């Protein structure tokens, strides 16, 4: 936001003066990807539109470990994952970065959980920034949540100590004593 940008003038100026913006973790590191145009072509080739739930069932047959499928956003896909032998599903819109018009994971969680009951573990990913967010997801039916930004922010700020601190904050926010006022 604007206030954050104003608080970091050196960074803002370097972004404004940058000649070109690129995906530094891919461009120049993957053969044939040198700019955003070739990145788009490379990305499109990474997905096989012919994949079906039968392929997922085949993977489960070949794999003797747990199969956890991330990206479930409908009850139908949840049931399909279950019928393929998935051990757990992760309700996730991948941070909204793939389809920014997709609903938030927390919005679809209750319907998906209701359609599956306790037949499969249901995890939720996306929007978890605090213990309250974890509690909300658990209350709506998630068996577990995943976090990303909270620990990444901690890592960026203080390294390993920051990750430890971020996790401690979330754990402390989940302390039952913190929610005694919610009990009847």
Predicted features and spans:
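Active-site entrance/lid segments in N-terminal catalytic domains of soluble metabolic enzymes
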Residues: 1-83, 95-98
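Alpha-helix-loop-beta-strand connector modules within alpha/beta enzyme cores
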Residues: 54-63, 101-122
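Glycine-rich beta-to-alpha transition loops that act as phosphate-gripper elements at the mouths
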Residues: 69-75, 121-134
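Catalytic cores of alpha/beta
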Residues: 76-84, 129-140
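Glycine-rich phosphate-binding active-site loops on the catalytic face of alpha/beta enzymes
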Residues: 90-102, 140-160
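C-terminal helical cap(s) of enzyme catalytic domains, especially alpha/beta-barrels
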Residues: 156-174
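Conserved small/polar residues in nucleotide/adenosyl-binding loops
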Residues: 180-184
């Amino acid at each position: 936001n604007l206030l954050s940008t104003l608080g970091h003038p050196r960074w803002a100026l370097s972004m404004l003066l940058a000649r070109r913006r690129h995906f530094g973790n891919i461009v120049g590191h993957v053969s044939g990807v040198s700019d955003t145009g070739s990145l788009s072509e490379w990305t499109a080739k990474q997905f096989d539109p012919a994949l079906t739930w039968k392929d997922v069932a085949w993977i489960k047959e070949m794999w003797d470990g747990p199969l956890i499928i991330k990206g479930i956003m409908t009850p139908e896909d949840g049931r399909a994952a279950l019928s393929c032998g998935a051990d757990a599903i992760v309700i996730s819109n991948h941070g909204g970065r793939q389809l920014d018009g997709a609903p938030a994971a927390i919005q679809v969680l209750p319907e998906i959980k209701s359609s599956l009951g306790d037949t499969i573990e249901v995890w939720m990913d996306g929007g978890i920034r605090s213990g309250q967010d974890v509690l909300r997801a658990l209350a709506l039916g998630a068996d577990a949540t995943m976090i990303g930004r909270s620990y990444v922010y901690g890592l960026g700020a203080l390294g390993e100590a920051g990750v430890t601190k971020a996790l401690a904050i979330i754990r402390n926010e989940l302390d039952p004593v913190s929610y005694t006022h919610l009990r009847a």
